[in-house]
Amino acid sequence: MSNIVKFPRASKPPAPEPVQPAAPAAAPAAPKAEGRGLVAGLVKFVWVATVLVWPVLKWVLAIITFFQFVRMLYHWNTPGVYAGWSFLAYFAALTAITYFVSIYKPKGL
């Protein structure tokens, strides 16, 4: 047996909707703060520059962070050497830049 598909019958096109008068023009937007556009443009520029060099920068930061980790392990019980804090700072920077490139996207791009 075959499956018979019934096509819809041709129907009359729907009646056009009545034309409504145009809405009044919206009030002009409030002026932007002078520094806001500058900061947004600067963040956008930094983001684009970081994204362009990210493949190389990621490797360099990862190698430096790994070196700081090994240095932290070597100087673990040495008084006066703050290698743990150095590693934490490098790791935080690597994490922050990874977030900045991967998740954050400036408005207007």
UniProtKB/Swiss-Prot annotation:
Keyword Chaperone: no
Keyword Cell membrane listed: yes
Residue ranges with Pro residues bias: 11-21
Transmembrane segments: 47-67, 81-101
Pfam families in UniProt: KleE (PF17394)
Residues covered by region (Disordered): 1-27
InterPro entries for the chain: KleE
Subcellular localization, as worded in the UniProt entry: Cell membrane
GO CC annotations on file: plasma membrane
Membrane topology: Multi-pass membrane protein
Chief site of localization: membrane
Keywords per UniProt: Cell membrane, Membrane, Plasmid, Transmembrane, Transmembrane helix
Protein name: Protein KleE
Organism: Escherichia coli
Gene name, Swiss-Prot/TrEMBL: kleE
